[in-house]
Amino acid sequence: MGKSTFLQDFKAFAMKGNVVDMAVGVIIGGAFGKIVSSVVADIIMPPLGLLIGGVNFTDLKWVMKAAEYGADGKETAAAVTLNYGNFLQATFDFLIIAFSIFLFIKLITKLTQKKAEAPAAPPAPPAPTKEEILLTEIRDLLKEKQ
């Protein structure tokens, strides 16, 4: 019986609205991140690289130690580089994603504020009390006698 209780507890937890909403958000966020990365890498960075001299940002690096080659021309030791271009690319990705999320949250906040500011429908009249119902019945009976 302990296992079924554990499974029931897990099912109740997993099916809560917040957990499901969060899972959907993570999946959509992952897809959105790929789209933004493509926009940055394929649309924004090439013109920016062209403006600064035809440089591809992902190729930017500082060579701390050059590669070593043997007498036969084969590389014997790889170069040691600090690839700051990849960091710049990731930074631009982050800034655009953060800005997009900011705009989305701002839009949602504005929409919820407008919804909250909308005039509420007038409240329904309260149900008649027992006394009012009794008085109505008495009135109707008196009308029938006349």
From Swiss-Prot:
Location (main, coarse): membrane
As for subcellular location, the record says: Cell inner membrane
Q: Look up keyword Cell wall biogenesis/degradation and say if it applies.
A: no
**Pfam families cross-referenced by the UniProt entry:** MscL
GO cellular component terms, alphabetically, are:
plasma membrane
Q: Does the keyword Zinc apply?
A: no
Instruction: Give the record's keywords alphabetically.
Output: Cell inner membrane, Cell membrane, Ion channel, Ion transport, Membrane, Transmembrane, Transmembrane helix, Transport
Entry's transmembrane regions: 12-32, 88-108
Please name the GO terms that the record assigns under molecular function. mechanosensitive monoatomic ion channel activity
The annotated subunit structure for this chain is:
Homopentamer.
Chain's role: Channel that opens in response to stretch forces in the membrane lipid bilayer. May participate in the regulation of osmotic pressure changes within the cell.
What family is this protein classified in? Answer: Belongs to the MscL family.
For this entry, the protein name equals: Large-conductance mechanosensitive channel
Q: Which organism is it from?
A: Bacteroides fragilis (strain ATCC 25285 / DSM 2151 / CCUG 4856 / JCM 11019 / LMG 10263 / NCTC 9343 / Onslow / VPI 2553 / EN-2)
Its lineage reads: Bacteria, Pseudomonadati, Bacteroidota, Bacteroidia, Bacteroidales
Q: Which gene encodes it?
A: mscL
